[in-house]
Amino acid sequence: ITNACFEPANQMVKCDPRHGKYMACCMLYRGDVVPKDVNAAIATIKTKRTIQFVDWCPTGFKVGINYQPPTVVPGGDLAKVQRAVCMLSNTTAIAEAWARLDHKFDLMYAKRAFVHWYVGEGMEEGEFSEAREDLAALEKDYEEVGVDSVEGEAEEEGEEY
């Protein structure tokens, strides 16, 4: 189940984590989980270089284990399982999702779609531009983090004698 967390099909936001670098990763396990197995799975991910971390945060994993089995809502859509894992991560791959969001915002804002509703509730039009600039800056920061760590690795490899 640990490896499944890193599959693009299991992400809450549509982005491919294999195209980015991780800055942090928190794995929260629940149920019938053995710490030794968890450590082995994470060690395998690290040694196989399944995922890449930025160079300034090489370890990057936090792990939590709750031995209570996952609960299910009676009459809900989820099946009862013995164990579950939830991963919270910070990866540069999210920049591609922000790029899509920027594009959609630009299309809608150019037509002033829904702007009147927000202005009617007390928001100023300048706040839209400010929020768009903030998101663009965040996207740029994440792209730079991914590129900087790639360049840093290339420099390190070039310094070997």
Curated annotation (Swiss-Prot):
GO molecular function, one term: structural constituent of cytoskeleton
Pfam families: Tubulin_C
Compartments (UniProt record): Cytoplasm, Cytoskeleton
Site residues, Involved in polymerization: Y161
Role according to the record: Tubulin is the major constituent of microtubules, a cylinder consisting of laterally associated linear protofilaments composed of alpha- and beta-tubulin heterodimers. Microtubules grow by the addition of GTP-tubulin dimers to the microtubule end, where a stabilizing cap forms. Below the cap, tubulin dimers are in GDP-bound state, owing to GTPase activity of alpha-tubulin.
Cofactor(s) this protein requires: Mg(2+)
Protein name: Tubulin alpha chain
